[in-house]
Structure formats: structure tokens, C-alpha cells
A protein has these predicted regions:
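Extended glycan-interaction surfaces of carbohydrate-active proteins
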Residues: 1-43, 65-116, 120-132
Length: 132
């Protein structure tokens, strides 16, 4: 990111997100009423981004708690939708949601301790950045 995750400004941003947008272990996109009314759903991809931020800021235990919590909302196949209804836990919106699953995977890799490794690039991929 443009700021180190342990920077005090990032930590205060993470705290504000947790205080104002986290409900039942999930993160809402926003809480302001719009053309559709007052939001009642969390936004799944934001939840995984929030967990990443927690982990990178050094709050690894809390990040893992949030991660384990959000996994409880997947369906019987482990799939997620774009949104989760905060009142019922129902998966709503686009289903299955590709961006959510991409974020789920990157968060799982990060929390496993493998996320800090630099990717190994194959020499035939000229556009790839080679590790130092």
C-alpha cells in the first residue's frame, strides 16, 4: 500500500472501519442511506480486505478471529455471495462472487504465513516481475 500497515494513520483507519462498518464480524461498504435505502448487508470482499489490513498491521490474532467468523457464512460448498444479509446471514447479491473468492484465497494465503513470500516467476513470462 501507499502507507505501511503499521503506520499510525493506517491503524487509526482500521480502527474507524472496525468501529463504524463492522457488524457481526462482517464489514459493510457504507452505512449512509442511498437510493436503495439504508444498507442492511455486508460487502464480502471488504470483509476480506479488512482482515488483510488487520493482519498486516500486526493484529494477527484478531485477523484470524475475523477470518474464522466470516467462514461460517459460506454455503454448504464453501461459496460466498457478493453480500451477506446482516439480520439473517443469508447470502445475497451476485452468487458465486468471483472477487469475493479471489479475496478469500489471498487472505487465506496471507494468514497461512505464505503471503509474504515473493512470487516465483517463470522465465517465459516476460511481463512478470522477477524476485530479487
Amino acid at each position: 500500500g501507499f502507507l505501511d500497515a503499521k503506520d499510525k494513520r493506517m491503524k487509526s483507519t482500521i480502527d474507524a472501519i472496525e468501529k463504524k462498518l463492522c457488524k457481526k464480524g462482517l464489514v459493510m461498504r457504507y452505512t449512509i442511506e442511498d437510493d436503495f435505502g439504508k444498507p442492511v448487508n455486508s460487502f464480502s470482499v471488504c470483509t476480506f480486505w479488512f482482515i488483510d489490513a488487520l493482519y498486516r498491521s500486526g493484529r494477527k490474532k484478531k485477523a484470524k478471529q475475523y477470518f474464522n467468523s466470516v467462514l461460517q457464512y459460506s454455503n454448504h460448498l464453501g461459496l460466498f455471495s457478493e453480500d451477506i444479509d446482516l439480520a439473517t446471514g443469508e447470502l445475497v447479491g451476485n452468487f458465486p462472487q468471483a472477487y469475493t473468492h479471489l479475496s478469500l484465497l489471498t487472505t487465506a494465503i496471507l494468514l497461512s504465513g505464505q503471503g509474504s513470500r515473493r512470487p516465483v516467476c517463470l522465465p517465459h513470462l516476460k511481463h512478470a516481475v522477477k524476485p530479487k
